[in-house]
Amino acid sequence: ATAEVRDDIMDILNLRDPFVLTTGFDRENLYYAVKRPRDKYRELLSYLKEKEEKMPGSSGIIYCLSRKNVEEVCYQLREDGFSVTRYHAGLSDEERKENQEDFIYDRKQIMVATNAFGMGIDKPDVRFVVHYNMPKNMESYYQEAGRAGRDGEPAECILYYAPIDNRT
């Protein structure tokens, strides 16, 4: 978190002289890649199939910029046989809670979500985070990608880039 955000948290929680641990940005267990595929979905499908072959049952998060993208990607992955669920602000509280629990407790392997998903989520064994679209800013990207590999094991953070992303 930025210094301003840390100060806000301390003020809101009324913390007096807290111990604050600040670490660097480098997490050696995370592999970062930016890809510019001709067909994002085909690239994603290929990536997930390879992941399933090498590491069956791996958990992962796919971040999309819009609810519409979440719905499209989740539907297509389900049609292609993946254990997938979704999360965005357009779902009822009940469905969001159910889908979140399905992911956390490994009833579903893949969460397709907007940035509404993730705050307060601590699932240590997330093996990959894919950004299907460009995130809104670097801070969002770092926070979302940082949900991978919290158990210290190797994890991948993949960003799919397309020129159209600059306009969204």
Model region roles, listed by residue range:
Residues 1-168:
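Helicase motor core with emphasis on the C-terminal RecA-like subdomain
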